[in-house]
Amino acid sequence: MGMSDFYGAADDARSIAAIHHALDLGVTLLDTSDIYGPFTNEQLVGKAVASRRDQAIVATKFGIMRAPDGRALGINGRPDYVRQACDASLARLGVETIDLYYQHRVDPAVPIEETVGAMADLVQAGKVRHLGLSEAAPKTLRRAVAVHPIAALQTEYSLWCREPEGELLATCRDLGIGFVAYSPLGRGFLTGRYRSLEDLEAGDWRRTNPRFQGENFQKNLDVVAEVRRLAAAKGCTPAQLALAWIFAQGGDIVPIPGSTRAERIEENAGATAITLSREDLAALEALAPQVAGERYMEGGMKLVNG
């Protein structure tokens, strides 16, 4: 996402080099969406994997509509739109089959059975291999799997976003659904690289995110200070510690940290070598109640847990 939109200026050459470096390191899951850009991130991923398709699991999403100029156009889970969106994504990606196709947000105006039914037709047509949902509630997951197996649920999960713990993760495990954790580094905050809003580019959407605002920002800096302290004691970076915590939550949870630079991807990959003790985990668990602010503005919060 950050390679094309939301996080400041894009640099396609650097981004493609970063994707290639990720593949070199054995990273296989590449996550995109038709709204990133909008549309241009799928094209970027398509260029990056064109000569290395067998090394990549390509996941994309539909359902949040944006105009070419970036304007938000709402949520759409209607069957005819599902088919249209998939064909457009296939063309932009330049692939014959999408490995994992998500509904980006649940459409409250369309029964999930209808949306997933249309997605299942894409599997039958050979256009999609596996189906996923994003930010879906437990009851929605149960209704969805009654229509077609759901391979993955993608939802925000990190040291500073613990909402999935409890019923949501339990439901995924009960139904055999893998969990893909987006923003596992707290939109970059947990890396410790941001000390004020001035560290973010002018076009960076985080400037409007509640957790990056005013008092919330200052309180969350205290959380990051503790992450930095614990990381130093482990001999790793704060980002690696935050990812190691995700890995420690279970083998069925896959984090997808966003990166635009090869060196950051290499840093993140290093998290797989870090083992956390019970004491480490207890210290990190204590940070959750200290996080300040909602993860989205009011409009965005209405679209999660659908």
Where are the regions a protein language model picked out?
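Active-site beta-loop-alpha junctions enriched in small/polar residues
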Residues: 1-3, 33-35, 61-65, 103-106, ...
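N-terminal small/glycine-rich loop or linker at the start of catalytic domains
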Residues: 1-7, 59-73, 97
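Aromatic-lined glycan-binding groove of carbohydrate-active enzymes
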Residues: 164-202, 237
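Conserved, mostly hydrophobic/aromatic
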Residues: 15, 30, 45, 58, ...
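N-terminal binding-site loop/beta-alpha segment at the start of enzyme catalytic domains
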Residues: 1-56, 60, 304-305
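Terminal-tail/helix-coil boundary detector
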Residues: 174, 202-233, 248-253, 260-262, ...
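Generic structural signal for well-ordered alpha-helices
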Residues: 19, 42, 46, 86-90, ...
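Glycine/proline-rich, positively charged
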Residues: 69-163, 167, 178
